[in-house]
Amino acid sequence: MQDSDSELEYATQYRSVFDELRNVMPHGTFPQPQVGGDAPTSPTWEVLPALPTDVFGAVAHLLRVSGTIGWFEPSSAGLGSDDSIFLSAEERIDLEELAKAWRTDGESEGVQDLWTELLSHKDACLRPRLLCQEGRGQGSLDWCKVAFKLILTADMAAEGLGRPLGGDEERVNVMRDLLSAKNQPDRGGQDEKTIAGSSLRRRHRHPASMTERIDTDVVCVLPKGRIAQVGCTLRSLSANLALLPPRATVRCQWAEPVAPLRHDDRATLDILLIPAPFEIQGIDFEEVPSSNGGAARDWGNFSLKQSWIEDPSLLEDITIKLIRQAKKQTKSLNAIIFPEYALDWGVFGKICDAAWRDAPELEFIISGSSNNCDQHEGNHVLTALRHEKSGRDNRPWISAVSRRKHHRWRLDARQVSDYALASALKPTVACWWESHKIMTPELYFHRFRQSSTFVTMICEDLARSDPCHEIIRSVGPNLVFALLMDGPQLPGRWGARYASSLADDPGCSVMTLTSWGLIRRVNQSGKYPPSRAIALWKDETGSVEQIMMPPGDGPAGVLVSLAGKDTTDRTIDGRCVSNWSWRFHGQQPILLNQAENHPRHRLMGLGLRACLSSMLSTR
């Protein structure tokens, strides 16, 4: 194939290395002093950025926009060629030594030499294809090779940031300590404040990027967990740092507890799943009137009325009793998860207060919600995390954060029929869209143990690849929890398919969870074989586990036991990294005993008429 005319006009029609460096670091690589109170002097790019994350972000951006990863030869064997980027085994060892000196002693002289060499190619064309074409006078792939040396060095200098190094290196990791200090929440000089109406404290935001000089409206950089074991991308090249999109695309944060992290151990991670609501009425789905009056259209908007929490004390009471039953099955209850839209902030706060009184060992509680702690309505996920003793009071404390759903649920005519909602949502309307504000998408990665990080998705966030799938693949959390308002969680349905994609790349363990109330509506429609699958587990081994609602229609839960396993991830340049993978190790039904499952509780699972009928039949 012949090159296009635009490519032949190479002398004036390409962006240079420096064009993109200046784009991603518009204020230079080093803070410029002010002279006599005047404006700072002109920015400079000759000095190596102080943080490996800045070097990584700048160089990874160069490699991404230039498409250079496809020209990199992963193997250190062989001789290389003029049309490939090759690093010998000796060169790779030298880079490891440079990174170790930078990481442990802050010594960066050798890295500065590489940075200076990169800038010597500042006028070079970004595109490897043009560089390799003969007779163009465009030079060679020299800048690309230097860029790969820099990105590997910066990535190795950040070891210990997302997972522990262990041994002596962990104790002398000055770069890890410096970067962790840069990731502290922006408190504005204030401690976390208790949220009105609960004992939970509002958690301040962590920075969107662990960088100083990078323009976060261009790229962001955060730590990394699992490494993709398939494909040839920048994601599979880095072991410790992740290149992310601009903060306005998705505002991400890497959140860590204030106090030291708990060690990963061989004990199970025991999670109580509570698939509330246990009953959903058809009239809980309500049409939202159109703002354009009576104009004809083939779509509509709907909202959900949470009739199941009209008496919030009922769900609180059930939750505490399920916790007590679960604690009869495990020495340590580690987490509680509710599905999408199960609670609101008020109920969530009260459940958290009561749950931590009964089970102080809990590490986190997650739930879908119709609002957040500021009473902003929408489709939210609420996350409460326990922090060990720290601060002035030297007591454990609980923080809370929230984010909005990234998409809107669309119900088509088939789904309206499947969920038996035709009386509430006209089946003649082609599609019904969930009504809620999205605003700036956010994604929070919660590091809850030394080698373990989780992220939570809300229904369509899992089903739609934009905007967060690429980010999750880059950061590689060990655990992904997907809160759904959906039917049965079957291996052949959409939840399992999209969970498989994240289990394959980058190796996340994924658990979906839906409400028993919506499954009951599907079962009662008679269109499909009845199912009690409220949750589904998928991990990198290909293992698929269906998690079943216990027998009966009353409120119940399931205790899921996960266990960590040492695993080795490998980058495409051959570096081996010790990592942590969570595997499924069983489920146990959690039922209220006969004395606790009185008619008031059964109202949530049977409905008023069925419950009254049951009561009369026992007289």
Regions found by a protein language model. Give the residues of each.
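CN hydrolase (nitrilase-like) catalytic-core segments centered on the catalytic cysteine
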Residues: 29-169, 178, 334, 346-365, ...
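Long, charge-dense tracts
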Residues: 72-301, 318, 339
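Short, compositionally biased "basic patch" segments
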Residues: 262-318, 418, 427-445, 555-570
